[in-house]
Amino acid sequence: MKKIKKHKFTKVYDLQNSSRTSFYKKILFPNANLNTWCSSETTLPNDKTKEEFDKNPVLDRFNHQLKSSGIETKHTMYPDFSWSCVDIEKIMNEYKLSNYILLFPFCSPHLTLKKWPYFNNLINLIKAKYKDQFKFITAPGPKEINEADQYDAIKILDNGKAVSISQLSSLIKKSSFVVANDTGPAHMAAHLNAKGLTLFGSHTTAKKVS
């Protein structure tokens, strides 16, 4: 917090709107309004409670929040993450990838309620129907490399390490289909216009995070 204070920021756009960032506001700008701290609370519509507003899709909330701060939101409602893609020919050739289904069976250690436990069952069902038409792959993060061995899928690494965000974007973009828990790669897939399915638990709804 001391390091943040040293920068003497004059405007903060809080798009996470979490209990953690709310705590930051109380410490850094305890009496701040919209002019200093832009959040879902400081830009809350007059006719809605915070609880009601938070039920709206996240992009709708971002759009309202930024517009309330005078920012043009040309791309907010239609994000395109394809700019992040890079050439992954080396990886594609190394793993002989052509038609593949990309799986993201992982989740944050403290959010295990997001983890769907039937990915191997799904792989077996698809293999039974489509035989060898598709390869199944995972692209684990740095702390998920060992966990990836639990799944009947090829573990994609770059020189023994987790692929970069840009490489991951390209793997998603080139995939035949994506199946993911409610994690970062699922949102990347949505904004890369990839075909796929995200599995949501009882913690949220597809509409709320769409």
Specify the residue positions occupied by each region the protein language model found.
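Catalytic machinery of carbohydrate-active enzymes
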Residues: 1-210
